[in-house]
């Protein structure tokens, strides 16, 4: 087993056979080409020469693809610098919005609409509850970031929200709740569930949804209705992480999340002729790291 391998090595070894047995979209094919050819000379080179000693250095250009693990550091730093003007020296909290896994087939078949619905439900929940005088009674700020994967490379759409811990009331006075988050998690859960499910139902009633693969049964009204009932009955589980330690930590944390891809090079621990092994957090075991070996479907 080779241990010194990268995402690029994995694509070089497995992509051609994967492409021959799977339906690949033009966007996916373009990303794969970029990853396989990044910093190889395929995108040109820069040559620099030292005027003193005459030493010549050749630098291969990167692909700059959003999905490439080798191309995120510079965009991240550029984005972080731009956000410094937006961050206040005030408490911030990290709230994560998730949906029941039963919805995954429909979301996967309707990514444009149902990713947008995630943003709508999360942002409306935060804004409306924060404006309620029972909780804070202010107009707050937040940044929402969509991730579509879990640590084990599974399909797991969820929203990371970085929430300002205070805001301006109707008299334009600043108001916050100190180091404690100002919204009850159970209230967030019920509100978010109601808003997301309402938009999902509206899309179904307006015949805007498509049903491919494992989502096909939900084209039937009664099967779809049963799915809605199942999801309404479940307790949706958003959670709030501890507050950040100052504005700079907020910015750094944001950069990590906005420019993260599904898996990075350091998590690839080995590769054979038929499998790839990578490390992942096991959230069913207190977030301890474990190794997972999978076949070419990686």
Model-derived regions: residue spans:
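Beta->alpha loop/short-helix hinge microenvironment recognizer with preference
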Residues: 1-298
């Amino acid at each position: 087993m080779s241990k010194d391998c990268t995402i690029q090595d994995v694509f070089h070894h497995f992509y051609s056979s994967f492409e021959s047995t799977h339906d690949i979209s033009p966007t996916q094919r373009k990303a794969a080409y970029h990853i396989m050819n990044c910093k190889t000379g395929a995108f040109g080179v820069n040559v620099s020469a030292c005027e003193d000693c005459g030493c010549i250095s050749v630098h291969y250009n990167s692909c700059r693809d959003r999905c490439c693990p080798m191309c995120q550091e510079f965009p991240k730093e550029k984005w972080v610098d731009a956000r410094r003007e937006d961050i206040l020296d005030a408490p911030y909290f990290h709230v994560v919005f998730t949906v029941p896994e039963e919805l995954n087939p429909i979301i996967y078949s309707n990514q444009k609409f149902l990713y947008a619905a995630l943003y709508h439900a999360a942002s409306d929940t935060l804004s409306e509850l924060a404006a309620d005088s029972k909780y804070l009674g202010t107009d707050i700020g937040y940044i929402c970031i969509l991730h579509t994967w879990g640590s084990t490379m599974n399909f797991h759409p969820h929203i990371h929200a970085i929430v300002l811990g205070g805001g301006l009331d109707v008299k334009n006075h600043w108001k916050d709740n100190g180091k404690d988050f100002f919204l009850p998690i159970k209230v967030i859960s019920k509100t978010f569930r109601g808003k997301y499910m309402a938009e999902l139902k509206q899309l179904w009633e307006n015949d805007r949804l498509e049903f491919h693969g494992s989502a096909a049964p939900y084209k039937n009204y009664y099967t779809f209705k049963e799915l809605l009932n199942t999801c309404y009955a479940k307790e949706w589980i958003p959670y709030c992480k501890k507050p950040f330690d100052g504005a700079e930590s907020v910015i750094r944390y944001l950069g990590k999340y906005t420019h993260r891809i599904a898996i990075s090079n350091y998590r690839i621990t080995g590769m054979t002729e038929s499998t790839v092994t990578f490390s992942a957090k096991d959230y069913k075991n207190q977030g301890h790291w474990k190794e997972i070996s999978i076949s070419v479907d990686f």
